[in-house]
Regions:
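Positively charged n-region of N-terminal signal peptides that target proteins for export
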Residues: 1-4
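Cyclophilin-like peptidyl-prolyl cis-trans isomerases
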Residues: 17-248
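Bacterial N-terminal signal peptides
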Residues: 6-14
């Protein structure tokens, strides 16, 4: 079965055909002004797959722009306001009006070059990492060295510790409030250090954050954006046209 629809992006992204090689792995051909890009949607991320198909079939992406293009990073689309935007207009705030529960399946799916992922609001307002209903991005990224990957692993480890620290602090907020009322900065610092020590120990008991060898190989050969792994839902990938600008 083949379906046709169009979406345009400031490159200009216009999606054109849907052709499934089987029912569980739909494939979409995205026509742009600089070349065609074909993506497949992963069967395991069912909510994101079904949502993308629904929006594409009803023409949501017809004539839409790639409103965010960052060299060596990614290109992003899905703002319906871009269909009628004048030159120079600020874009990125438009969406479907709903979100999709996160389907983060790292390390099965990750931000290698060509990955298709859902945009979302930041953790400060979106701690459950729910995805945008309509906005998505395609990963360009860059090839990384072993040293770069080591730094990313170290930063990821620290973020895990910090996130757990925040959870543990939240569970001890009454105790912390008592110390704050006393205005004893020494005790407050000691309390925070104690909680951070617990967080670090718990994270280390699970093992250090390390990229699996196949993932490491991809980031050192084709490239990607590893610092976004386990943060955003990756729900597909480019299967043809990865060398179309700006992916070349």
């Amino acid at each position: 079965m083949i379906k046709t629809f169009v979406f345009t992006c400031s490159l200009i992204l216009s999606v054109v055909s849907f052709a499934g090689n089987n029912d569980s792995v739909p494939v979409y051909n995205i026509k742009t002004t600089v070349g065609d890009i074909t993506v497949k949607l992963y069967p395991e991320t069912t909510k994101h797959r079904d949502n993308f198909i629904k929006l594409a079939d009803k023409g949501y992406y017809d004539g839409i722009l790639f409103h965010r293009v960052i060299n060596n990073f990614m290109i992003q689309a899905g703002d319906p306001k871009s269909k009628t935007a004048v030159k120079g207009a600020a874009l990125g705030s438009g969406d479907t009006g709903y979100t999709i529960p996160a389907e983060i399946l790292y390390p099965q799916y990750y931000h290698k070059k060509g990955a298709l992922a859902a945009a979302r609001q930041g953790d400060d307002v979106n701690p459950k990492r729910a995805s945008s209903g309509g906005q998505f991005y395609l990963v360009k990224g860059k090839v990384l060295t072993e040293g770069m990957l080591f730094s990313i692993e170290r930063d990821k480890q620290r973020k895990l510790e910090k996130d757990l620290f925040q959870e543990l602090i939240a569970a001890q907020k009454e105790e912390l409030k008592k110390l704050q009322l006393k205005k004893d900065q020494t005790q407050i610092a000691a309390f925070n250090d104690s909680i951070m020590g617990i967080a670090r120990q718990k994270i280390r008991e699970k093992g250090e954050y390390k990229l699996a060898l196949p993932i490491r190989k991809d980031y050192k050969t084709i490239g990607g954006i590893p610092h976004l792994d386990n943060e955003y839902t990756v729900f597909g990938e480019i299967v043809e046209g990865i060398n179309a600008h700006p992916f070349s």
